[in-house]
A protein has these predicted regions:
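Structured binding/interaction patches within domain cores
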Residues: 1-203
Length: 203
């Protein structure tokens, strides 16, 4: 039943609360990073760009969270960003504090606008898939599939997702959720995508 509840839920705050025990902090941090990336105008302010890059390194264990201590309070970040604390600015805080990504993500989502909440819902599904329907990707980890997944992860260019679907089918994948996710032309893919992560063995 919980899997169906996840599929129906439209409130990102409720999706966050539904995440099972032991969920991936790495994935949650990538969710936050992508939310910030989508809401801050480009080019990012220098502070935002620096913090965002650091947060992504922390997510993949390429940096230590202590390296982000130079921004430590909500008030300081609000002053740095120069705007109110809705949506993207709240999420930027999550990146800088980093000690409890789950609590800080809740704090931020509670302050998101309705449109930001809708986008957060979409991103949570892109990154976590349906965490109550576990899929074993091991049988489909051919050299071709893994190479495609790794290339997209490293480059952030997910244009090869339909090609990945073909490679997965060649490897024997007949899971409609996986194949449809790869081939959906309306789906925006980001680093942390549940299919790409599954193939790369990332949690």
């Amino acid at each position: 039943m919980i899997a169906e509840t996840w599929e129906r839920e439209e409130d990102a705050r409720e999706l966050l609360r539904l995440l099972p025990n032991g969920f991936s902090r790495r994935k949650l941090r990538h969710f936050v990073c992508e939310f910030v990336r989508s809401h801050f105008p480009l080019p990012l302010r220098i502070e935002a760009a620096t913090v965002l890059a650091l947060a992504e390194q922390i997510a993949d264990d390429e940096a230590n969270v202590d390296e982000g201590d130079w921004v430590v309070t909500y008030e300081e970040l609000d002053e740095r960003a120069g705007t109110s604390f809705a949506g993207g600015n709240a999420f930027l805080l999550v990146l800088t504090i980093g000690f409890d990504i789950y609590d800080d993500a809740h704090w931020a989502l509670d302050r998101a606008t309705s449109s930001e909440n809708e986008q957060a819902n979409t991103l949570l599904r892109e990154i976590f898939g349906n965490p109550f329907r576990l899929i074993d990707f091991a049988p489909w980890r051919t050299d071709t599939a893994v190479s495609l997944a790794r290339g997209m992860y490293d480059s952030r260019d997910f244009g090869a997702m339909p090609i990945l679907a073909d490679a997965l089918q060649d490897a024997g994948c007949d899971n409609e959720d996986v194949l449809n996710h790869c081939r959906d032309a309306k789906q925006t893919h980001v680093r942390g995508c549940w299919v790409v992560d599954g193939l790369l063995g990332l949690v």
